[in-house]
Amino acid sequence: MEQDPDLLFFGGDQNYHHTEHTVGWIEFGMHFRDIFRDRPNICIPDDHDVGHGNVWGESGKNATLPGSADGGYKFPVKYVNQVQRQQSWHLPDCPHPTPVNRDISVYFTRITVGGVDFAVLEDRKFKSGPAGK
């Protein structure tokens, strides 16, 4: 390995298997297994991980327009929560895990690596879609 990072950060789009997240997640892990073994990593989901080309979470509402332009999620809550759980299970617990609409879980935390404190924040879940409110 040419690079020897102290920390890995994956900010989304780890997975493009829009209807079979677990398959894509295992595939992602297999690609990076050698570097995951001995260093901390931060991994958070983004639009493609939850089956969207773009996602404006609109605080968890159900998307109804083509392309989800009204905001929200087109896949079931169970799927959205599964994706987040699979990708963030290894990070410290969220200090205030109050879910958004439809009981979609939220995720934010902090992690300290090498004396540096990192805030891990998600934002896509709270954005409004381009069709507006």
Regions found by a protein language model. Name each.
Residues 1-133:
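Metal-dependent phosphoester/phosphodiester hydrolase catalytic core
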